Amino acid sequence: MARAVRAGILGASGMTGGELLRILASHPGVEVEWATSREYAGKPVHTAHPHLRGFYTGLKYTSIDKIDIGEVDVVFNALPHGVGASIVAEAYENGVRVVDLSADYRLRDQSLYPKLYGFKHPRPDLLEEAIYALPEIYGEKLRGARLAAVPGCNATAAILAAAPLVASKIIDMDVGIIVDVKAASSEAGSKPSRHSIHPLREGSARPYTPWGHRHAAEAVQVLRDLVGRGIRLSLVPHAVSMTRGVLASAHALLRDNIGFSEAVRAYASFYKDSQIVRVKPMAPGLPVDPPDVKNVIGSMFAEVGFAVEEESGRITGFAAIDNLVRGAAGQAVYAMNAMLGFDEWEGLRSPPLRP
């Protein structure tokens, strides 16, 4: 029997790091060699993640300055944006595969980083090397890749909702797409803030960064790859009262003489090979439930749907995902599987939780 792949996790005490540990605990081909945390260094993994008590019994958090990058086969970077970019580059240069869950290698245009993330990228030469880890579009490129950039959760949902519209060219590209996103509180991470604490988040719904969310740049980059031209896209997220999940609604104007039947073909064709996207067309008289985050929680599944408003000539694409699994740790494990030659769904076959 071949030895297990040795993995290291940078930033393993946050919500994304915890979800990554949860998924890897059931992966038969991976052993976590080290997991870093500044706050919990020297303490067991379950100190930060009590639901993992009984797993990783011999593993304690370590500080970044004590890790040996070269002793692992793959590094997952779950550190805050900008913090781990140089460590990722070091791992890459030492022949270690890297799966980056931060935004540090998602965008190929280095000029966007100061504007969107507040730092000058330390290794712009590696931006073109990173494969954007969205299986439905870049799955083939992930196989054997050395550096994978895990999409943002809002970007994942936005792209899944809008990609069939763009790829099929059934919408007016010059008018563009407006994406409305409903985002759960876990998207804000484990550190409490003025707007993320329960008394202020529960029962609330509010927009945030409506003047140009960072994840819009990811969506534009991917949609441009699909059609080979620029596209206008606005993404406005809303903080809503749920713990997990993202629901994206992508609004666009159909081209003349395009209707429901063309939309059915567009979505069916785009997702025909996907094992984890459930396509749910919506129209009067169709006995189909709409995409719902409740149907995908805890899983890699995405529910995608669309509706056509004949009177206005508009179409809305929808996508519901779990922000911590499909929008983060699950896509990271999928990328690792593809990069290292595992079955791509190893460790990811769990059905969703409901209710």
From Swiss-Prot:
Involved in both the arginine and lysine biosynthetic pathways. It comes from Aeropyrum pernix (strain ATCC 700893 / DSM 11879 / JCM 9820 / NBRC 100138 / K1). Transmembrane segments: none annotated. Pathway: Amino-acid biosynthesis; L-lysine biosynthesis via AAA pathway; L-lysine from L-alpha-aminoadipate (Thermus route): step 3/5; Amino-acid biosynthesis; L-arginine biosynthesis. It is found in: Cytoplasm. This is Putative [LysW]-L-2-aminoadipate/[LysW]-L-glutamate phosphate reductase. The active site is at 153. Disulfide bonds: none annotated. The gene is lysY. GO terms for biological process: arginine biosynthetic process via ornithine; L-arginine biosynthetic process; lysine biosynthetic process via aminoadipic acid. Its EC number is 1.2.1.103, 1.2.1.106. NADP(+) binds at residues 13-16, 323. Keywords: Amino-acid biosynthesis, Arginine biosynthesis, Cytoplasm, Lysine biosynthesis, NADP, Oxidoreductase. PROSITE patterns: ARGC (PS01224). The keyword Membrane does not apply.
